[in-house]
Regions:
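Core catalytic alpha/beta fold that binds nucleotide/phospho-ligands
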Residues: 1-208
Length: 208
């Protein structure tokens, strides 16, 4: 598995935007421009550029994204030999690529929040473990990004309740499917996890 990530905390210059934008097929360009906020447009653009750069490492041509298809749950895919997933939060965009099976990735900036708003998304055991943790905020975001990475790997959208995902150490399970979990260290203010439906023998991170 390869994880590509980039940091973006300001508007891209017009020239840089145009260079990246022109690398993408018209359909993806249209998707990007539907976003109202510049932050969302940038995150969408950079996610696709990370994907494109990553796919090139696997031997795909520069115009390969024109062949993107979408599952019934609107999850993009290219072919059966490769899987990928993109996530963004705050100032980071991440993209995981896997040529051995399914993959999901999630990153979240660890902002202070009211835990009670998420009580219904956590089991009693998870809730108690969080309150017993020396760093409740970190535990919450670890749990959240693990579950989100599994959901994204499953590729069935919001049809999988967070309560149905059971995380234990380096694995998580949902609907009799076992997922292997790996924590990605990108920034101390963020939580990021990758999930794969097979044992993760190798994982490489690349800053772009």
């Amino acid at each position: 598995i390869d994880v590509f990530y980039t940091h973006c905390d300001a508007l891209l210059t017009t020239d840089t935007w145009d260079i990246y934008f022109q690398k993408l097929p018209q359909g993806i360009q249209t998707q990007i421009m539907r976003f109202k906020r510049w932050q969302d447009r940038h995150a969408s653009l950079l996610g696709k550029i990370l994907l494109l750069e990553g796919l090139k490492k696997y031997g795909y041509p520069p115009d390969c994204l024109k062949n993107l298809s979408y599952s019934p749950y609107n999850r993009p895919f290219l072919d059966d030999s490769i899987d990928f997933n993109i996530s963004h939060s705050g100032e980071y965009v991440v993209c995981a690529i896997n040529n051995e099976g399914r993959v999901g990735i999630d990153i979240e900036r660890m902002r202070p929040l009211d835990f009670s708003e998420f009580r219904n998304y956590m089991t009693s055991e998870e809730w108690n473990m969080m309150h017993e943790s020396p760093d409740q905020l970190e535990y919450f975001y670890e749990l959240w990004t693990v579950k989100e990475s599994v959901i994204k790997g499953e590729g069935k959208g919001l049809s999988i309740p967070l309560l149905d995902i059971h995380w234990e150490g380096e694995t998580a399970s949902v609907s009799n499917n076992l997922w292997y979990i790996r924590k990605i260290l990108i920034d101390p203010g963020y939580s990021c996890h990758v999930a794969a439906n097979h044992e993760i023998s190798e994982l490489h991170t690349h800053k772009v």
